[in-house]
Curated annotation (Swiss-Prot):
Belongs to the bacterial ribosomal protein bL17 family. The lineage of its organism: Bacteria, Pseudomonadati, Thermodesulfobacteriota, Desulfuromonadia, Geobacterales. PANTHER family: LARGE RIBOSOMAL SUBUNIT PROTEIN BL17M, RIBOSOMAL PROTEIN L17. PROSITE patterns: RIBOSOMAL_L17 (PS01167). The keyword Ribonucleoprotein applies. Pfam families: Ribosomal_L17. The keyword Ribonucleoprotein applies. GO terms for molecular function: structural constituent of ribosome. This is Large ribosomal subunit protein bL17. Part of the 50S ribosomal subunit. Contacts protein L32. Keywords: Ribonucleoprotein, Ribosomal protein. GO terms for cellular component: cytosolic large ribosomal subunit. InterPro entries: Ribosomal_bL17, Ribosomal_bL17_CS, Ribosomal_bL17_sf.
């Protein structure tokens, strides 16, 4: 029985799955939108939201925690200097998943996961 075993295995070993999530979250924060399967998008959403919350915290420990997960220093810098300030007034819900349809080769359900864009302040 699999009671209280949350999360998807995605047909991978634990180390492969964690490495894939790290790579995908790094790409998502770098490009701000990626195309992937529905299941992978739903899984990396929680990790990406946690990284943005670390960025909003902004202290040294949060910076080190984010740097331990995100693979590129430039993306960590972007997270703390560009992405986190954009969401300073938003309490969660930093990403959106849009379903695209099915992939031609294997009919896997594809989705776009992207960072929610904040409306630019209007000048009067």
């Amino acid at each position: 029985m699999r009671h209280n075993n949350s999360g998807r295995r995605l047909g991978r070993t634990t180390s492969h799955r964690i490495a894939m999530f790290r790579n995908m979250v790094t790409s998502l924060l770098n490009h701000e939108r990626i195309v992937t399967t529905d299941a992978k998008a739903k899984e990396i959403r929680s990790v990406a939201e946690k990284m943005i919350t670390l960025g909003k915290r902004g202290d040294l420990h949060a910076h080190r925690q984010a740097a331990a997960y995100i693979r590129e220093k430039s993306v960590v810098t972007k997270l703390f200097s560009t992405i986190a300030p954009r969401y300073k007034d938003r309490a969660g819900g930093y990403t959106r998943i849009i379903k695209l349809g099915q992939r031609l080769g294997d009919a896997a359900s594809l989705s776009v996961i992207e960072l929610v864009e904040e409306a630019a302040p209007q000048q009067s």
